[in-house]
């Protein structure tokens, strides 16, 4: 009998998306094929401690509006051996400090936001010589930072929306830029996700408060012109032989749903109040769907991505415009990425297996 592949599912983390990472991990733990994979669940506390947990999916769900999390009491504290000669070893930091608690073949970093999705854990895993699911250091960092995502997409000749970046030394948007952007605008942490810290601004006198909110999560802020149009999404998946495929296109509809006339897909709408309708496949012409799929793969290549990504679009009268790239999209039960692949004929367990197998085939180092 072939030995099962040992997969460390790493979740939680130090970012404001800690809870959503836990929910994604719970869904993944339910769907990894136990006949093929031996799961080693590793939680990261909001303070940054790594712990070996029991990995029970039911503890990683949103229950009656309460968000899950990882604490120091969730399990045994551990560290990843950074020496490639001890590749994949998880070492105890408890009473038996230095003992090997587990050794893994591959890491699935189900981490959203800074200190996980931004190239940091990817760099650690490269140093340790441990294969991992998803994008490498460069693509993870570029995909996390909306400023550099847009720069790379623009350099590749891909359509992006108008925007202004506010660095920590810059207090507000200039009058010239305000005139160009118009209203409304969306004010966001440049390196964040799950709509945390995001505001829709319809009057310029509300801009300072929106910038202050965004800067609670990131000192660098991006202010984006609103783009009228439908919200479409498309998944990209790399296979073990290196070829790429784009998924069925999906659509998120918020305006008019549960009173959300502003059409703002915020954190509560995404995760807590069922305030959006998800159409998979999207009700668009075949030509539009094919254009979106093609742009998704071009965007994936533009940031030198690997493994997987979800590319978000606005469908305007002039055609699709790329909003963001998510190099570790959500894997919750309502997340679009697995739903779009299911509609494309790849069920959840097969999708996860493909990602793990691709990570192992790719390995680490320059490639």
Swiss-Prot record:
Its EC number is 6.3.2.4. It comes from Mycolicibacterium vanbaalenii (strain DSM 7251 / JCM 13017 / BCRC 16820 / KCTC 9966 / NRRL B-24157 / PYR-1) (Mycobacterium vanbaalenii). Pfam families: Dala_Dala_lig_C, Dala_Dala_lig_N. This is D-alanine--D-alanine ligase. Binds 2 magnesium or manganese ions per subunit. The lineage of its organism: Bacteria, Bacillati, Actinomycetota, Actinomycetes, Mycobacteriales. Mg(2+) 1 binds at residues 312, 324. Cell wall formation. It comes from the Bacteria. The keyword Ligase applies. It is found in: Cytoplasm. One of its GO terms (cellular component) is cytosol.
């Amino acid at each position: 009998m072939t030995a099962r592949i040992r997969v460390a599912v790493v979740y939680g983390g130090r970012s404001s998306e800690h809870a959503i990472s836990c929910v994604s991990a719970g869904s993944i733990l339910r769907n990894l094929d136990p006949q093929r994979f031996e799961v080693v669940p590793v939680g990261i506390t909001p303070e940054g401690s790594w712990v070996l947990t029991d990995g029970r999916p039911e503890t990683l769900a949103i229950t009656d509006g309460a968000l899950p999390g990882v604490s120091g009491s969730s399990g045994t504290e551990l560290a990843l051996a950074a020496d490639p000669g001890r590749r994949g070893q998880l070492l105890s930091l408890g009473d038996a400090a230095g003992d090997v608690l587990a050794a893994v073949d591959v890491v699935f970093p189900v981490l959203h936001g800074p200190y996980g999705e931004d190239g940091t854990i990817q760099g650690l895993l490269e140093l340790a010589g441990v294969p991992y699911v998803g994008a490498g250091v460069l693509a993870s960092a570029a995909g996390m930072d909306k400023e550099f995502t847009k720069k790379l997409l623009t350099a590749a000749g891909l359509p992006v929306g108008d925007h202004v970046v506010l660095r920590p030394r810059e207090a507000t948007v200039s009058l010239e830029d305000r005139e160009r952007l118009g209203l409304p605008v969306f004010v966001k942490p440049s390196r964040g996700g799950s709509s945390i810290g995001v505001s829709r601004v319809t009057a310029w006198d509300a801009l300072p408060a929106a910038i202050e909110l965004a800067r609670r999560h990131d000192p660098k802020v991006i202010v984006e012109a609103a783009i009228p149009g439908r919200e479409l999404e498309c998944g990209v998946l790399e296979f073990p032989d290196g070829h790429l495929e784009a998924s069925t296109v999906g659509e998120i509809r918020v305006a008019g749903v549960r009173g959300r006339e502003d059409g703002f897909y915020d954190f509560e709408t995404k995760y807590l109040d069922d305030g959006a309708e998800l159409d998979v496949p999207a009700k668009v012409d075949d030509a539009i769907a094919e254009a979106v799929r093609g742009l998704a793969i071009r965007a994936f290549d533009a940031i030198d991505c690997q493994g997987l990504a979800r590319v978000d679009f606005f469908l305007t009268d002039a055609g699709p415009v790329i909003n963001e790239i998510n190099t570790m999209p959500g894997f919750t039960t309502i997340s679009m990425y697995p739903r779009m692949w299911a509609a494309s004929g790849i069920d959840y367990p097969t999708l996860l297996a493909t990602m793990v197998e691709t990570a192992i085939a790719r390995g680490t180092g320059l490639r």
